């Protein structure tokens, strides 16, 4: 059965896939074809795999419902990237208001869309600036509150715990209510609590306000990517997501720089926390000016009804690509959290041990680390997006493979930096730069994977679920885990100075490996209980610079083991990505067909 013989209500809506595939426009728009052309199509379809869907697209495409038309549509949706869209730069999707135009290139993106993306990127930037401002002044915070490495790591951990616990709540709300209002309330909350926290004189109150900051930030991070997914499709979506995720490394780097320099100028680390709240208030008003696009708008679907939360969770758990990519992303979060929190302090201790660097200033180290982090993000995030767009045209499983490659390359580079930091500053910075660059290949790609293996009405929930898992087993525990391990090692070295050397190194690395594996398999609590107990009694104990350096060095080796584990998760993701993408396409088709039936019955009534 051909497409033209189907009932009008089940006719597939021409989607933005046609922008890159003129054959699809021509075949669906023509009244017939020659017998030779039909024969060629059938031959091509016969050679097409059962999962022959347009894997280069990060959107779900609507397809006919009967078997013959399904096979024809699979053939038509095969990419022909050397053609230009015959209808010009925009393609209007029937069934959507005329204003709903899907841009095919950067020059055709409308002002409203640019404004929305710019605001979301700005808020994401100050989000990560705020998150890592304390890392740039961590030594001053420790000295002011008289706390050890374990308590210093706990500052980030309580923030991330509240962040991940509230993410599912905002994910549920984001799939059902006004997203700009939810984000505005959240940004206002974290701006207010950050400002109030800077005035707290007791560590207990200070850490409580850091936890409240996490609640506010969860509202934004869960929802913002889904708005971008409803505005763009295909390569354009990947480009905009790459732009959005620039903010993670760039904002983190600015957090180190702004935090350290503001504290230096004001001669008080508390002023470092009073910069982002001002920007946050501006962001609240900008967020209220953006329009909330219809969910599924860019994929030719509109007014789709959300399913129950139980159904959403059940579908996500059964989605193997989503679960495995989330596990891989958890490893990315673990490494990024540990490196971002402890990197400046560790590099400072290591370089201070080099001859002639005894008077090195930590503010300068934090500044250099921030610049390197920003440069690695400016290059790594778009490089990952570019590799994805280029390779996925030929290799449908390229996205998870690129992520695995980034983690497996980053692991030895960061290990080398840990070993070289007390002897070669230039080499250390170079290894950290390339290690972070490889790690940053993941950010935009993982977000894109989620968006094309999950149907539009579940995306905010999926974002929240991914945030919950990745932070619960990733950067929620990594700063505290690294701090607790370093405290335990420092205590041992302080009691047994003669153990500092190769024997201690091998033993400590073995302990770190075991702790990293325990974290990945959800047994981290049991593995670190003894470390927490031994570290608690030594918070106020004085350690030498060598002991502090070696404690952090051995603890940070855990990140390399976790990166290898993450690479394995992404390799497994590649085994299921095509099938799960196809399932998401069919799910969107079924939901759209059901909605069309309901609309028709309503019109008849």
UniProtKB/Swiss-Prot annotation:
Effect of a null allele: In most cases, death at the late pupal stage, probably due to lipid accumulation in endosomes/lysosomes. Some flies survive until adulthood and display a strong rejection behavior of female flies in response to male courtship accompanied by decreases in the viability, adult life span, and oviposition rate of the flies. Some oocytes and adult neural cells undergo degeneration, which is preceded by reductions in programmed cell death of nurse cells in ovaries and of neurons in the pupal nervous system, respectively. The central nervous system (CNS) of flies accumulates lipopigments.
Annotated spans, Disordered: 1-94
Transmembrane segment boundaries: 115-137, 153-173, 180-200, 203-223, 240-260, 271-291, 329-349, 367-387, 401-421, 431-451, 465-485, 558-578
Signal peptide: none
Glycosylated residues, chain numbering: 149, 319, 519, 583
Expression sites by tissue: Enriched in brain (at protein level).
A family per Pfam: MFS_1
One GO term describing the cellular component: late endosome membrane
Biased composition (Basic residues): 76-85
Molecular function GO labels: transmembrane transporter activity
Main location: membrane
Polar residues bias spans: 55-67
Compositionally skewed regions (Low complexity) per UniProt: 27-38
Topology within the bilayer: Multi-pass membrane protein
Listed GO biological process terms: cellular response to starvation; courtship behavior; endocytosis; endosome to lysosome transport; glial cell differentiation; glial cell migration; larval central nervous system remodeling; lipid transport
Places the protein is found: Late endosome membrane; Lysosome membrane
Keywords from the named record: Developmental protein, Differentiation, Endosome, Glycoprotein, Lipid transport, Lysosome, Membrane, Oogenesis, Transmembrane, Transmembrane helix, Transport
UniProt feature coiled coil, ranges: none
Domain of life (superkingdom): Eukaryota
UniProt KW Acyltransferase keyword: no
InterPro entries in alphabetical order: MFS, MFS_dom, MFS_spinster-like, MFS_trans_sf
Family membership noted in the UniProt record: Belongs to the major facilitator superfamily. Spinster (TC 2.A.1.49) family.
Protein task: Probable sphingolipid transporter that plays a central role in endosomes and/or lysosomes storage. Involved in TGF-beta-mediated synaptic growth regulation both pre- and postsynaptically via its function in endosomal storage regulation. Also required during oogenesis by regulating yolk spheres storage.
The name this protein goes by in its record: Protein spinster
Species of origin: Drosophila melanogaster (Fruit fly)
């Amino acid at each position: 059965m051909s497409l033209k013989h189907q009932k009008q209500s089940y006719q597939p809506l021409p989607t933005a896939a046609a922008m890159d595939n003129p054959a699809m426009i021509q075949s669906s728009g023509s009244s017939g074809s020659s017998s030779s052309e039909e024969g060629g199509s059938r031959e091509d379809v016969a050679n097409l795999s059962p999962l022959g869907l347009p894997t280069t697209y990060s959107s779900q495409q609507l397809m006919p419902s009967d078997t013959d038309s399904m096979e024809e549509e699979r053939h038509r949706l095969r990419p022909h990237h050397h053609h230009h869209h015959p209808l010009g730069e925009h393609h209007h999707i029937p069934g959507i208001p005329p204003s709903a135009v899907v841009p095919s290139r950067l020059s055709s993106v409308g002002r409203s869309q640019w404004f929305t993306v710019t605001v979301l990127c700005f808020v994401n930037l100050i989000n990560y600036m705020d998150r890592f401002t304390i890392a740039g002044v961590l030594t001053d915070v420790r000295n002011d509150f008289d706390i050890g490495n374990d308590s210093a790591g706990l500052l980030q951990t309580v923030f991330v715990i509240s962040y991940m616990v509230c993410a599912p709540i905002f994910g549920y709300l984001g799939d059902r209510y006004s997203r700009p209002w939810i984000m505005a309330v959240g940004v206002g909350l974290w701006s207010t609590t950050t400002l109030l926290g800077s005035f707290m004189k007791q560590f207990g109150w200070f850490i409580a306000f850091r936890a409240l900051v996490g609640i506010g930030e969860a509202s934004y991070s869960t929802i913002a990517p889904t708005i971008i997914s409803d505005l763009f499709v295909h390569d354009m979506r990947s480009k905009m997501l790459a732009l959005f995720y620039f903010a993670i490394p760039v904002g983190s780097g600015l957090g180190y720089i702004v935090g350290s320099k503001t504290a230096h100028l004001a001669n008080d680390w508390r002023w470092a926390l009073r910069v982002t709240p001002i920007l946050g208030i501006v962001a609240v008003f900008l967020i209220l000016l953006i329009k909330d696009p219809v969910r599924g708008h860019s994929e030719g679907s509109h007014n789709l009804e959300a399913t129950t939360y139980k159904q959403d969770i059940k579908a996500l758990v059964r989605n193997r690509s989503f679960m495995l990519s989330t596990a891989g992303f958890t490893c990315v979060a673990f490494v990024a959290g540990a490196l971002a929190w402890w990197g400046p302090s560790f590099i400072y201790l290591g370089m201070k041990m080099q001859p002639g660097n005894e008077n090195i200033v930590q503010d300068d180290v934090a500044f250099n680390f921030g610049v390197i982090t920003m440069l690695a993000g400016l290059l790594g995030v778009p490089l990952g997006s570019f590799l994805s767009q280029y390779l996925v045209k030929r290799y449908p499983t390229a996205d998870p493979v690129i992520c695995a490659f980034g983690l497996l390359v980053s692991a030895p580079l960061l290990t080398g930096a840990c070993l070289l930091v007390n002897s070669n500053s230039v080499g250390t910075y170079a290894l950290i730069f390339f290690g972070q660059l490889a790690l940053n290949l993941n950010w935009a790609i993982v977000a894109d994977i989620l968006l094309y293996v999950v149907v539009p009405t579940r995306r905010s929930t999926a974002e929240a679920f991914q945030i919950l898992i990745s932070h619960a087993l990733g950067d929620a525990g990594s700063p505290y885990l690294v701090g607790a391990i370093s405290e335990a090692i420092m205590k041992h070295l302080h009691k047994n100075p003669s153990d500092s050397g190769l024997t201690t190194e091998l033993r400590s690395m073995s302990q770190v490996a075991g702790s990293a594996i325990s974290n990945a398999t959800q047994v981290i609590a049991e593995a670190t209980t003894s470390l927490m107990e031994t570290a608690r009694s030594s918070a106020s104990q004085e350690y030498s610079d060598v002991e502090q350096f070696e404690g952090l060095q051995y603890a940070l080796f855990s990140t390399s083991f976790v990166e290898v584990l993450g690479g394995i998760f992404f390799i497994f993701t590649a085994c299921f990505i095509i099938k799960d993408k196809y399932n998401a396409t069919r799910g969107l088709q079924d939901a759209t067909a059901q909605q069309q039936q309901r609309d028709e019955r309503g019109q008849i009534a």
